[in-house]
C-alpha cells in the first residue's frame, strides 16, 4: 500500500513539476527574448555611441587644431617680442605699418602706456598677423588675435576678419577669464584657458583660447584668439537627430544645439569621468559625455530614448506577443497534459489503491488461503492469515517440493498431506508483483472433500451393487411373473379360438381382460424401472406415422364403440409419409393417452388430431371426460400420482402411465403438455421432431377435380377437416340446405339420412361403424369417423377412379394367412418349462405350423440332427445349455435357419444379448397369437424364398 501511496504522491509531484517545467520553459523563452532585445538594444547603443564618438572626434579635432594654432601664434609672438622690456627687435617694415586697436579690460587699465612701450613690437606683430592672415588664417578659420599685457591689462586687438563683435559680452567674458587666470594657483598659471561665448543664433558662438607668453621666464602678456564655432560642424553627415552641448568644468552649459528634448542638464557623476556613456535619470535620453583636452571643456551628445528604441520597438512587441502566445500555449499544453495524463493517472492510481485495498480485504476475508510466493526461492511475500496457518503446517520437504514445482512451471496444482493429516490442495498461477516473478497460490483444505469423495465412492459402489441387485430383481420378477402369466394368457387366447358353451365365453372374456390388465400393470412397472435405471433405449428407424395412427385407431375403435363413444381421427394432408423415430414407443405413448381418454370419458367423443407444427409432428388427444383440477395438473406426470380420491376409486391403474409417457417423449427429443378443465375434458398434446421427414406430393386426384360434394355435417371439426381434405383432392364442397343436387353429386352427412338422396351417392359418417367403408344400400355408404382421411379413396371408388398407392393411406401390414397354409413349415420349440412348451406347440398348431419340441439346448441339437427343421423357437434361460449357447452352436454348425428367442426378461439388455448371440429376433413373454403370427410369417416367407 505504501508503494501505491508513493506512486500516487509521485504522480502529484510530477504534475507540479510539469507545471514548474512549463513555467521554466516560459521563463527561459522570456529570458532569451529579453536577452535578444537587450542585445539588440546594446547593439543599437553601440551604433549610437559609435556615431557619438565620430562626432566627438570632430569636436576634439577642432579643439586640438585651435590649440595647435595657439602654439604657433605663441611661438610667433615670443619671436617678435624682444627680451628687453618687452620690445621687439627692429626690422625692416612697411611704411604703412598699422598699429592694432587697444581696449582697456579694467577701469585702471593704461592702454597709452602699453601702446608707447610696445609700439614697435605690436607693429611688427601686426604686420606678421596681416601676413599670416593673408596666407594662412583662412585655413584656421580665426576671427581675431589679441594680446593682453600682464601689467597694464590692456588688450591689443589684431582683427583678422570683419566680424561683428558683441563688445560687452566679449569683454565681460575676457575679464572673467583673466581674473580666473590671475587667481589660479601657481601650478595652473601656465595652462591655457578655453571658453565659449554664445552667439546670436543657437548653436553658433565664439571659441576663445588664451595662453601666456613668457620672456625670460617672466610673464609678459596673454595671447588669445577668437574663433567662430558652429555646433552643427560637430555632427557626422547623416547622423541621428541628436543634441550636442559643450559644458565647462563645472558642468555649466556654454553652447548647445539641442535635440527634441531641450538642453541637457549635467549630472555630477558625468563630471568625474573623462568619458561617460549612459542614460539620464528617468531614462529619457542616451548621453555621451567626453572631455576635450587640452581644454577643460566637455562635449555632451544626447538622443531621446524613443529614437534608441525606434528600431527595436517592433522587436519588443513581437517578443511580448511571442511570450504571451508561448505562455498561453504552455499553459494550455500543461492543462491538457494534466487532464489527459496526470489527472487520469492519479485517478487510476487512486482506483488502483482502492483495488489494492479491496483485494487485500478480499484476500484477508477469503475462506481459502491465498498467498504470493517468490518463484526463485519460494519466500512468502504476501498472505492472509489462513494461508499463513496452512504454510506453517507444511514440512520442510513439502516446502522444497512446492518451490521446485513453482520454478518448474510444469503443473498448476499439487496435493499435500500435512503433518497433522490435513489434505491441502495448492493451486497457483504465475504473475509479476512489484517487479518480481511470483506465483499466486491458493491453499484449500480439501480434507472434507476427500472424505466426501471417499464416502461418495463407497456410495457409488453401493449404488452399483444396488443397481445390479435391482437389475437382477427386475430380471427375476420379469421372468417369474411373465412365465406363469404366459401360461394363463396363452391358454385363454387358445380357448377363445374354440367354440364355447353359452355363458362360458363371458367368463373367458373376463379372465382375459383381467390377465391383460395384470400384464399391463407389470409392463408399466418394468418400463418405469428400466427408464429410471437408464436401461430403456430408444430404437429409431424409418416408419410411417399414418400407419401407426391407423393401427392405433383400429385397435381401440372396438373399445370406443363398446362404450358408445366416438373416436375421430384427423390426419392432416401435410403429415409426412415417413420419418425417423421409434414407432413402438410412439405407439405406446399414444395408446396410453388414448386408453386414459377412453377410461375417463363416459359421454361424448375422443378426437385424435395429427398435424405438422413447424419442425415438429404434433399429435393431440382430446376427450370430453371428467377433466382434471388445475392444482393437480402440475403433478400429473409424477410417478404413482393419481387424480383425486373419487377418480382413484372409480378407475384402476398404477399412476405410472403418464410418467412413462413423459419420459419416453423426452427421450425422443419431444415434449408433452396438458390442458384440462374439470367437467369439460382434457387435451394432451405431444410433439416429436421431424427427423428425416419425407412429405407427400401435393396433387389432386385425377377424376375428382370438378366434382361436387354437399356437406350436411353437424360436427364443426369434422366438417372443416372434410372441406380441407377434399379441397386438396380438387373436390368442390358446399353446405347442403335442401338444394336440388345434380346427378353426379355426393352427399356427406354425419347422421342418418332423412330422405333418399337423388344424387350419385351418399356417405354417412357413423361413430359406431368399425372397419372399411361399406355400401349398406345402393348409393348409401357408411364410413368410420376414425378414418376420415380415407374419404378421397372412397370417393374415387364411388366414381370408379383408380388411385396410386401413394394417394391412399394403408393400415399396418398384416399377414392374412389361413391355418392350412403353414403346414409346410416345421418349427422346433425349445423350452424347459413343460406348460410353456406345450402352450407354444398348441399356438403354433392353431396357426397351422408343424411342430417338434425339445427340453433344452442339448436335446434341441439332437432333434436338429435327426429332423429337417425350418425355424427354431427357443427359450433363452434353460438348464444344461441355454438359448444363447444353442444359437451359437447352430451357427457354428453352419446352419442359417431362423432362430427366434423367447424370454421372460423384458430388459433391453436381454434382447440385445439375444441378437448378439446370433438370434434373428426375440419375443417377450407372454407371447400372444398376433405377435407370434406376425413374427413367424416374416421368417416363413424367407424360408420359402430360400427353398425356391
Swiss-Prot record:
4-aspartylphosphate PTM positions: 875
Function noted in UniProt: Component of the Rcs signaling system, which controls transcription of numerous genes. RcsC functions as a membrane-associated protein kinase that phosphorylates RcsD in response to environmental signals. The phosphoryl group is then transferred to the response regulator RcsB.
NCBIfam families: PRK10841.1 (NF008099)
Pfam families: HATPase_c (PF02518), HisKA (PF00512), RcsC (PF09456), Response_reg (PF00072)
Annotated Histidine kinase domain residues: 476-692
CDD domains per record: HATPase_EvgS-ArcB-TorS-like, HisKA, REC_hyHK_CKI1_RcsC-like
ATP-binding as UniProt keyword: yes
PAS domain residues: 357-425
Membrane topology: Multi-pass membrane protein
Subcellular location: Cell inner membrane
Cytoplasmic face of the membrane: 1-20, 335-948
Catalytic activity: ATP + protein L-histidine = ADP + protein N-phospho-L-histidine
UniProt modification remark: Autophosphorylated. Activation probably requires a transfer of a phosphate group from a His in the transmitter domain to an Asp in the receiver domain.
One annotated GO molecular function: ATP binding
Subunit structure: Interacts with RcsD.
Taxonomy of the source species: Bacteria, Pseudomonadati, Pseudomonadota, Gammaproteobacteria, Enterobacterales
Record-linked InterPro entries: CheY-like_superfamily, HATPase_C_sf, His_kinase_dom, HisK_dim/P_dom, HisK_dim/P_sf, RcsC, RcsC_C_sf, Sig_transdc_His_kin-like_C
Species in which this protein is naturally found: Salmonella typhi
Entry's transmembrane regions: 21-41, 314-334
Family: Belongs to the RcsC family.
Ranges for domain Response regulatory: 826-940
Protein name: Sensor histidine kinase RcsC
Biological process, per Gene Ontology: regulation of DNA-templated transcription
SMART domains, sorted: HATPase_c, HisKA, REC
Domain spans labelled ABL: 705-805
GO CC terms of this entry: plasma membrane
Amino acid at each position: 500500500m505504501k508503494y501505491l501511496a508513493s506512486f500516487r504522491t509521485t504522480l502529484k509531484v510530477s504534475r507540479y513539476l510539469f507545471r514548474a517545467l512549463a513555467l521554466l520553459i516560459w521563463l527561459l523563452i522570456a529570458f532569451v527574448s529579453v536577452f535578444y532585445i537587450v542585445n539588440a538594444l546594446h547593439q543599437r547603443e553601440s551604433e549610437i555611441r559609435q556615431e557619438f564618438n565620430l562626432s566627438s572626434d570632430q569636436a576634439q579635432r577642432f579643439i586640438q587644431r585651435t590649440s595647435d594654432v595657439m602654439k604657433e601664434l605663441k611661438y610667433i609672438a615670443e619671436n617678435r617680442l624682444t627680451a628687453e622690456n618687452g620690445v621687439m627687435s627692429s626690422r625692416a617694415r612697411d611704411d604703412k605699418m598699422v598699429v592694432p586697436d587697444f581696449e582697456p579690460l579694467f577701469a585702471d587699465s593704461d592702454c597709452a602706456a602699453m601702446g608707447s612701450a610696445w609700439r614697435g613690437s605690436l607693429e611688427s606683430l601686426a604686420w606678421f598677423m596681416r601676413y599670416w592672415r593673408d596666407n594662412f588664417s583662412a585655413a584656421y578659420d580665426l576671427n581675431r588675435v589679441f594680446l593682453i599685457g600682464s601689467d597694464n591689462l590692456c588688450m591689443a586687438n589684431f582683427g583678422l576678419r570683419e566680424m561683428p563683435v558683441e563688445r560687452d559680452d566679449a569683454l565681460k567674458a575676457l575679464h572673467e577669464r583673466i581674473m580666473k587666470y590671475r587667481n589660479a594657483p601657481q601650478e595652473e598659471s601656465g595652462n591655457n584657458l578655453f571658453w565659449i561665448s554664445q552667439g546670436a543664433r543657437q548653436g553658433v558662438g565664439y571659441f576663445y583660447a588664451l595662453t601666456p607668453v613668457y620672456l625670460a621666464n617672466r610673464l609678459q602678456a596673454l595671447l588669445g584668439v577668437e574663433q567662430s564655432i558652429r555646433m552643427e560642424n560637430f555632427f557626422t553627415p547623416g547622423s541621428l537627430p541628436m543634441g550636442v552641448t559643450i559644458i565647462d568644468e563645472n558642468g555649466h552649459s556654454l553652447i548647445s544645439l539641442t535635440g527634441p528634448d531641450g538642453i541637457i542638464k549635467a549630472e555630477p557623476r558625468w563630471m568625474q569621468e573623462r568619458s561617460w556613456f549612459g542614460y539620464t535619470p528617468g531614462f529619457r535620453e542616451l548621453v555621451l559625455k567626453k572631455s576635450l583636452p587640452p581644454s577643460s571643456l566637455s562635449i555632451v551628445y544626447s538622443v531621446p530614448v524613443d529614437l534608441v528604441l525606434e528600431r527595436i520597438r517592433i522587436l519588443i512587441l513581437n517578443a511580448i506577443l511571442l511570450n504571451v502566445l508561448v505562455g498561453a500555449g504552455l499553459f494550455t499544453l500543461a492543462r491538457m497534459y494534466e487532464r489527459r495524463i496526470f489527472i487520469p493517472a492519479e485517478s487510476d492510481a487512486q482506483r488502483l489503491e482502492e483495488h489494492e485495498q479491496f483485494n487485500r480485504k478480499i484476500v484477508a476475508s477469503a475462506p481459502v488461503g491465498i498467498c504470493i510466493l517468490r518463484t526463485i526461492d519460494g519466500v512468502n511475500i504476501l498472505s492472509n492469515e489462513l494461508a499463513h496457518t496452512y504454510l506453517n503446517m507444511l514440512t520442510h520437504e513439502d516446502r522444497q517440493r512446492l518451490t521446485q514445482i513453482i520454478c518448474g512451471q510444469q503443473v498448476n496444482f499439487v496435493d499435500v498431506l500435512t503433518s497433522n493429516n490435513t489434505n491441502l490442495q495448492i493451486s497457483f498461477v504465475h504473475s509479476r508483483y512489484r517487479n518480481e516473478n511470483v506465483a499466486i497460490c491458493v491453499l484449500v483444505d480439501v480434507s472434507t472433500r476427500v472424505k466426501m469423495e471417499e464416502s461418495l465412492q463407497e456410495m457409488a459402489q453401493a449404488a452399483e451393487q444396488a443397481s445390479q441387485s435391482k437389475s437382477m430383481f427386475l430380471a427375476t420378477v420379469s421372468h417369474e411373473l411373465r412365465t406363469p402369466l404366459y401360461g394363463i394368457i396363452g391358454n385363454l387366447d387358445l380357448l377363445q379360438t374354440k367354440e364355447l358353451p353359452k355363458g362360458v365365453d363371458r367368463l373367458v372374456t373376463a379372465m382375459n381382460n383381467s390377465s391383460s390388465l395384470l400384464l399391463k400393470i407389470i409392463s408399466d412397472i418394468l418400463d418405469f424401472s428400466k427408464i429410471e435405471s437408464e436401461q430403456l433405449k430408444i430404437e429409431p428407424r424409418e416408419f410411417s406415422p399414418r400407419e401407426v395412427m391407423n393401427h392405433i385407431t383400429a385397435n381401440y375403435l372396438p373399445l370406443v364403440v363398446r362404450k358408445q363413444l366416438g373416436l375421430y381421427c384427423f390426419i392432416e394432408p401435410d403429415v409426412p409419409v415417413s420419418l425417423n423415430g421409434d414407432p413402438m414407443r410412439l405407439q405406446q405413448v399414444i395408446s396410453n393417452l388414448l386408453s386414459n381418454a377412453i377410461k375417463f370419458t363416459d359421454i361424448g367423443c375422443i378426437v385424435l388430431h395429427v398435424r405438422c407444427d413447424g419442425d415438429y409432428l404434433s399429435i393431440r388427444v382430446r376427450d370430453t371426460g371428467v377433466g382434471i383440477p388445475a392444482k393437480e395438473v402440475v403433478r400429473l406426470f409424477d410417478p404413482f400420482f393419481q387424480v383425486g380420491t373419487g377418480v382413484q376409486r372409480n378407475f384402476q391403474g398404477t399412476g405410472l402411465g403418464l410418467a412413462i409417457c413423459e419420459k419416453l417423449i423426452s427421450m425422443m427429443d419431444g415434449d408433452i403438455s396438458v390442458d384440462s378443465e374439470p367437467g369439460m375434458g382434457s387435451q394432451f398434446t405431444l410433439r416429436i421432431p421431424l427427423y428425416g421427414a419425407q412429405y407427400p406430393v401435393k396433387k389432386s386426384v385425377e377424376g375428382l377435380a370438378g366434382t361436387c360434394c354437399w356437406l350436411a355435417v353437424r360436427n364443426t371439426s369434422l366438417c372443416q377437416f372434410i372441406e380441407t381434405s377434399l379441397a386438396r383432392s380438387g373436390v368442390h364442397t358446399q353446405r347442403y340446405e335442401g338444394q336440388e343436387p345434380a346427378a353426379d353429386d355426393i352427399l356427406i352427412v354425419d347422421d342418418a339420412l332423412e330422405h333418399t338422396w337423388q344424387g350419385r351417392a351418399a356417405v354417412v359418417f357413423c361413430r359406431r361403424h368399425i372397419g372399411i367403408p361399406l355400401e349398406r344400400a345402393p348409393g348409401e355408404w357408411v364410413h368410420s369417423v376414425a378414418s376420415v382421411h380415407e374419404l378421397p379413396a372412397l370417393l374415387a371408388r364411388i366414381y370408379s377412379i383408380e388411385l396410386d398407392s401413394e394417394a391412399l393411406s394403408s393400415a399396418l401390414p398384416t399377414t392374412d394367412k389361413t391355418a392350412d397354409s403353414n403346414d409346410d413349415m416345421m418349427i422346433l420349440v425349445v423350452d424347459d418349462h413343460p406348460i410353456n412348451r406345450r402352450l407354444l406347440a398348441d399356438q403354433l398348431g392353431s396357426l397351422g405350423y408343424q411342430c417338434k419340441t425339445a427340453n433344452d439346448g442339448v436335446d434341441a441339437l439332437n432333434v436338429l440332427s435327426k429332423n429337417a427343421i425350418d425355424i427354431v423357437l427357443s427359450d433363452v434361460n434353460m438348464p444344461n445349455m441355454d438359448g444363447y449357447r444353442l444359437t451359437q452352436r447352430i451357427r457354428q454348425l453352419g446352419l442359417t435357419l431362423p432362430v427366434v428367442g423367447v424370454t421372460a426378461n423384458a430388459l433391453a439388455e436381454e434382447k440385445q444379448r439375444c441378437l448378439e448371440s446370433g438370434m434373428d429376433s426375440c419375443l417377450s413373454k407372454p407371447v400372444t397369437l398376433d405377435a407370434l403370427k406376425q413374427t413367424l410369417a416374416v421368417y416363413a416367407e424367407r424360408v420359402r424364398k430360400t427353398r425356391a
